[in-house]
Amino acid sequence: MKKKYIFPLLALCFTGNAFSQTLSQAQKWFTEGKFAEAKPVFEKLVRQAPSNANYNFWYGACCYETGELSKAVPYLEKSAERKVINGFLYLSKAYYDLYRFDEAIQNLEDHIYWLERKKRDTSEAET
């Protein structure tokens, strides 16, 4: 009877470990600027958890950095709605590149507002 439960528990442990390794690897690639490598991982994660604001940010930012501006916008909008601070910055960049200047300005202002609220440096965003 005990053997019946051991295999599924072991399988569950290995699956969870593989998931965290995949996420941490994708985050590492993102930090290193390897957006094309990280993008498929974040795409899979955002499909699995579409309401996760961070997954939406990472995937949207990867889309932006790989030149898919229009594809990036809905994911970045979702992350900004959930107050992911850098979501506002990337959304501002995407709107600017799509000639949606009023929206770009508003999102940049929102980015600065949330940086100030979290007591972070705003000098880079204000230049």
Where are these regions (language model features)?
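Register position in tetratricopeptide repeats
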Residues: 31-32, 65-66, 97
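Short coil turns that delineate tetratricopeptide repeat
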Residues: 50, 82-84, 116
